Amino acid sequence: QQNFLVYSGGTCNSRGSIEGHFLALTDFKSINKLFLPKWGKEEWPSAPQNIYAQDEKANNLFIFPNDIDTIYSYNQQKGAVYPFLFLDFHGDFLTKDKHPYGPGEDQEMSEIITKRKYIYSHYSFNQASGKLFFKLVGKREDFCSINLKNNVLYSFNRLFDNFMPISYNPFIGSDGKNLYVLVQEKELAEHYQNIKCTYPAIQRLLPALSPDGNSWILLTIEIKE
């Protein structure tokens, strides 16, 4: 029997919760287990990008839900979800208890986004070579990397040769050892007009790139242990 871990949509009502929970272990015929009781007052379901990251060594999953400052671990053998890491952003992370609700929700949320009052979202959650990666959005716009050997978090705002992609979700996947990054042709062309390229694979691409080009390029970033 094959089981699947399913995300509900994260709301306080039946439209976006599974029997009042965020996650369920199901075979799509019946619910076997429920995880993470719902909290907050969110009424509209959402589907965050990259909510899961695979733990290649243990064949488990890391889970980073939206509006929750905790990364969880799903143990496939035990069929259970456990808190794995609490992320302390010193009050700057917009959790469900700080999220605006009610008649003025749209206006308040718009102000949070435009004035960058909080870290209001995260993207690009992946695992590669024993490290977790994700990108913050809002009050902080940097990338974060967590070394799973010692749980130390590092932040950075450039990927290679001081390149910063404009995409809000640049890490589109991982094979466990490499991160896959999607960038636009004109991004690379413009970036390297005045900066020396130190990567041979990118050097070979540059002559064919145009500052006006709209093609997308898939890059592989090898993450060392």
Predicted regions mapped to residue ranges:
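Blade-level signature of beta-propeller repeat domains, shared across WD40, Kelch, NHL, RCC1
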Residues: 175-225
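Beta-propeller blade signature
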Residues: 18-29, 69, 142-151, 208-223
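Conserved blade-ending motifs and adjacent loop-strand segments that build the rim/top face
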Residues: 81-119, 148-176, 188-190
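Exposed, low-structure sequence patches enriched in small/polar residues
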Residues: 62-70, 118-122, 126-141, 146-151, ...
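Short loop/turn segments that connect beta-strands within the blades of beta-propeller domains
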Residues: 16-19, 27, 57, 65-67, ...
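Short glycine/acidic-enriched loop and turn motifs that connect beta-strands
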Residues: 10-16, 68-70, 139-140, 186-188
